[in-house]
Amino acid sequence: MNHLKRQDEKVFAAIEAELGRQRSKIELIASENFVSEAVMEAQGSVLTNKYAEGYPGKRYYGGCEHVDVVEDIARDRAKEIFGAEHVNVQPHSGAQANMAVYFTILEQGDTVLGMNLSHGGHLTHGSPVNFSGVQYNFVEYGVDAESHRINYDDVLAKAKEHKPKLIVAGASAYPRVIDFKRFREIADEVGAYFMVDMAHIAGLVAAGLHPNPVPHAHFVTTTTHKTLRGPRGGMILCEEQFAKQIDKSIFPGIQGGPLMHVIAAKAVAFGETLQDEFKTYAQHIINNANRLAEGLQKEGLTLVSGGTDNHLILIDVRNLEITGKVAEHVLDEVGITVNKNTIPFETASPFVTSGVRIGTAAVTSRGFGLEEMDEIAALIAYTLKNHENEVALEEASKRVEALTSKFSMYTDL
């Protein structure tokens, strides 16, 4: 980054500081990951200069012959990975991918069935502070009070009662496998469309380690980062019958020119996903999550639903007599990055919360294995149990430093 250093020392310094943070801390935010150098090179390429409104072969600008190739590569690879009939790789985010699906099939005020945010859903699945909850009549379903797993009988009952035009499955904080086949059966029974937001589990689906929603859903949306380990962005997969409508909803519906440098990075990431090594990586994500969950439970911590089937773990910190906000802060102090998170049947404010969400995608990318999961579990428990003990926190910080120093990353930067 010599050019940047000469041109803008302040921005360069901030980026260098962030690189230092990523190297020195244990990254456990479930929605974050570390992309390859190849993905970063594509995203930082000359494609950032090119406007390309429209789609390959039908652009509103000249000079698009090379970016057309890139977008076709991204679309074709995504189709191959997930077995989709049609793919749109232009959404700038998962939220915009969801918006495009809603705009394709819904009218303002239509009824939609979506997962309660505090039970693990997402803002764009009907939260009243989000456009989805403002534009549409979302009815919430959630998890069972005892098992903390989706109550499919409740989903069916609410679908029969409210007759939604669309049912949305998928979550941002649900650590268990979702039965997409059951959801589609419910949707068919009430004559609803079925959409899956697989943003968190897309990489696991790609590796064949989580049921694929594509054969069951009319529409599937995802981000391209998280477990998929690509650049920050979105994508829509759908049946061919909806292809033209979806494409029109993205452009000119809610977006203008696509970010061709990001689409190039998506293409590179999808190419990585198609390699055998990616399946091994995804299996390590799950193995690490299970080991970490077991370690946390051995330390006496309470996990929502009692464990995990994917990359994600949700810790209920109430028995430690602290809040999610305090837990996030004290863990960050010792070098462990997490996020506070609501838990099912939450009573605290979203700014305070009773839980902490963690995930293993980023640490697995860094090379952490089962032994490191044991140490991380011990560190999390030790830190939270001693959150007011400065001596203990200093010891935890040194243990984090000792652990991260064994795993180099981005050595060429």
Curated annotation (Swiss-Prot):
Pathway named in the protein's UniProt entry: One-carbon metabolism; tetrahydrofolate interconversion; Amino-acid biosynthesis; glycine biosynthesis; glycine from L-serine: step 1/1
Annotated GO MF terms: glycine hydroxymethyltransferase activity; pyridoxal phosphate binding
Transmembrane segments: none
Keyword Amino-acid biosynthesis (UniProt): yes
Keyword ATP-binding: no
Principal location: cytoplasm
Catalytic activity: (6R)-5,10-methylene-5,6,7,8-tetrahydrofolate + glycine + H2O = (6S)-5,6,7,8-tetrahydrofolate + L-serine
Sites where the protein binds (6S)-5,6,7,8-tetrahydrofolate: 117, 121-123, 239, 349-351
Enzyme Commission identifier(s): 2.1.2.1
Site (Plays an important role in substrate specificity): 225
GO biological process per UniProt: glycine biosynthetic process from serine; tetrahydrofolate interconversion
Gene3D superfamilies attached to this UniProt entry: Aspartate Aminotransferase, domain 1, Type I PLP-dependent aspartate aminotransferase-like (Major domain)
Cofactor: pyridoxal 5'-phosphate
One GO CC annotation: cytosol
Broad EC category: transferase
UniProt entry keywords in alphabetical sequence: Amino-acid biosynthesis, Cytoplasm, One-carbon metabolism, Pyridoxal phosphate, Transferase
SUPFAM superfamilies linked: PLP-dependent transferases
Localization per Swiss-Prot or TrEMBL: Cytoplasm
Pfam assignment, any one: SHMT
Modified residue annotations for N6-(pyridoxal phosphate)lysine: 226
Annotated family: Belongs to the SHMT family.
Summary of the function given for this chain in its UniProt record: Catalyzes the reversible interconversion of serine and glycine with tetrahydrofolate (THF) serving as the one-carbon carrier. This reaction serves as the major source of one-carbon groups required for the biosynthesis of purines, thymidylate, methionine, and other important biomolecules. Also exhibits THF-independent aldolase activity toward beta-hydroxyamino acids, producing glycine and aldehydes, via a retro-aldol mechanism.
Classification via PANTHER family: SERINE HYDROXYMETHYLTRANSFERASE, SERINE HYDROXYMETHYLTRANSFERASE 1
Subunit text: Homodimer.
Protein name: Serine hydroxymethyltransferase
